[in-house]
Amino acid sequence: MSRIATSPAVLRQLLSASLRVTPAGSVEILDAAQLRQSGAATIAWTAAFSTDEATVAAAQWLARATAVAAGIQSASIAPLYAARANGAYEWLTVPALNLRSQVFEMSRTALETAAAMDGAALIFELARSEQTYTFQRPADYATSVLCGAIAAGWRGPVFIQGDHYQFVAKKYATDPEGVAAEIARACRLAVDAGYRNIDIDASTLVDLALPTVQEQQRVNAVRTAEAVALVRELEPAGLEISMGGEIGEVGHQNSTAEELAAYLDEFDVALASRSAGARGLRKVSVQTGTSHGGVPLPGGGVAEVALDFTVLKELGELARARGLAGAVQHGASTLPEDLFHRFPEVG
């Protein structure tokens, strides 16, 4: 039976049949079946619901250490994206799941389903805005996902992502450096929590009133490059955190090839000036007709989406020609099931 521990000592006692902490500070799994059945939930629920900070910290540490003992790694998806960019894979699409509640249960179910269909390329992500209203810091979210992986009996990489680390345009207009500092802090917290994938969204800063596409995308590219350069300083030695950018604010007009090319050109210049030789982006999110949450209708339904797969295909090909894995379709959660097969078709 899963329980919420009231202290680190009680947590160790509740888990004593499932695992032990060795004198060297690692975790040894004693009963894998019991760990999956109840131990992982005890760690997850204690981390989420305990009111004692030391107990929460102990549960978060146990989640990371137990995951390692179980053969689970919070991993960067950059190697897979690099292989896609090099043409090693076709017909590949990577769904990203924004789990806002019941994260332990939902990540477990998602990974059990993936294992049953011999799948592994899926991302668990949470946006900065979602962190706020769901009261989940990166460390909280990573703990729940890793515990879900343990409960699922998963082995191998788990991709956890900071989604939409977004520059809020209204705040940026009056305090640009303050907003940039917020994004930098978010990146630091994500890396510290074990996130190995982060998406920066400065597309809100695009100014379509400027005369050229390069000028329109410049602030977007520069602020994204600043964040990428910071993450390159923070990432562990020998590991590349997968970084994403964005050119089309979701829910607004469709992106174009000219915009993507201008953004990547401006980004490359900005990154080189801050961190010469640093690895840049692995993907770029674009807008092709969706909006987050869909467009609600008066009767309670959701309007059909006029999704432009031609645009997605064109931008994906351009992105791969520039060494990226492709283009990312945001706001797909409300799309009808009969459209999802199109994503690997168009790349």
State where each predicted segment sits.
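Glycine-rich, proline-tolerant flexible connector loops at the mouths of alpha/beta enzymes
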Residues: 95-96, 122-138, 167-170, 200-218, ...
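Helix N-cap and loop-to-helix transition residues
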Residues: 52, 103, 134-137, 212, ...
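Alpha/beta catalytic barrel-like cores
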Residues: 1-179, 186, 195
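Short coil-to-beta-strand
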Residues: 118-120, 156-158, 191-202, 279-283
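Hydrophobic alpha-helical membrane context
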Residues: 175, 211-213, 342
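Active-site beta-loop-alpha junctions enriched in small/polar residues
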Residues: 98-102, 127-131, 161-167, 203-205, ...
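Active-site capping/gating regions of soluble enzymes
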Residues: 1-46, 59-75, 183-184, 191, ...
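Short amphipathic alpha-helical segments, especially helix-boundary/capping motifs
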Residues: 83-88, 118-123, 205, 238-241, ...
